[in-house]
Amino acid sequence: MKRRQRLTARSRLRAGIRCHNRFYNAMVQDLASAKRNGVYGERLAPLFSELVPAETLKTALGVSLAFEVNLGQRRPDCVCTVQFGKGSDAKGVCILIELKTCRFSKNMNTASKNLQRKGGMRQLHDSCRLLARTLPPGSGEIVLAPVLVFVAQRGMRVLRVTRLSPQVVYSNAAVLSCTISRLAEYAPPVSAKSTRRRCVAKGTKAKAFSTKAAAEPVPSITPAQPSAAAAVVSLFPAAVPANTTNAAAVHQPVAVSHVNPLAWAASLFSPK
């Protein structure tokens, strides 16, 4: 009996991890499409529409996604930063997302889901506090928006979105994006669809061949040592009101290295 319970717990954990990874990859594709077309898809609309309208996202200077961001005591599943201008005084939005996966979606008020919700809210509160302590210097107004998302393991449908009250901090949006990307420990794998390549050899006819991405997820990348940053006074009180929506209905400069394995995340959606 105990062995069976252990196996069940392990299988549930593996299923949750697989769902997280699939959702990460879907977010990259969906957000790229929204940035390009100015329209949110069904999956992103309940997450982003109230924070950054799609048309505003389309005209943003840059949008970045980072996954499994190592903040020390906490590691938010996803952090999305949106930059609306150039310079250290540019405004921006930083959305911290915590994912909770569900095997069954008919009843969202079960005891286990309520425990997931309480744990997720606590994780988001801690993540915001830790991020505020390591903000890069800058005078730009940045909105920190924590969001808890329940996702169905089948179909990756967004079932419920719970938002903590946004907090306003001051930082450099561009450097913040790079800093967060540098702390990311996961990169979504390349699409499993076959990609066509052209092999050209001198004196021979070019031959097309296809390669498939590895099925195994990308291994964790060890983050660089956190850069020294001035401490920021905590802006997050212990009790923060939440908004729940059912998806169905003066600082010294800090140098940040741009040469890292996840540099693509900071410029993935930047205008060409």
Curated annotation (Swiss-Prot):
Record's protein name: Protein UL24 homolog
Protein family (similarity comment): Belongs to the herpesviridae UL24 family.
What Pfam families does this protein map onto? Answer: Herpes_UL24
Q: What does this protein do?
A: May participate in nuclear egress of viral particles. Plays a role in the dispersal of several host nucleolar proteins including NCL/nucleolin and NPM1. Since deletion of host NCL/nucleolin negatively impact on nuclear egress, UL24 supposedly acts on this process through its effect on host nucleoli.
Q: Which organism is it from?
A: Equine herpesvirus 1 (strain Ab4p)
GO terms under cellular component: host cell Golgi apparatus; host cell nucleolus; virion component
Q: Does the keyword Magnesium apply?
A: no
Classify the main location: virion
> What induces its synthesis?
Expressed late in the infection cycle.
User: Which gene carries the instructions for this protein?
Assistant: UL24
* Localization (cell): Virion; Host cytoplasm; Host nucleus, Host nucleolus; Host Golgi apparatus
Write out the entry's keywords from A to Z. Host cytoplasm, Host Golgi apparatus, Host nucleus, Late protein, Virion
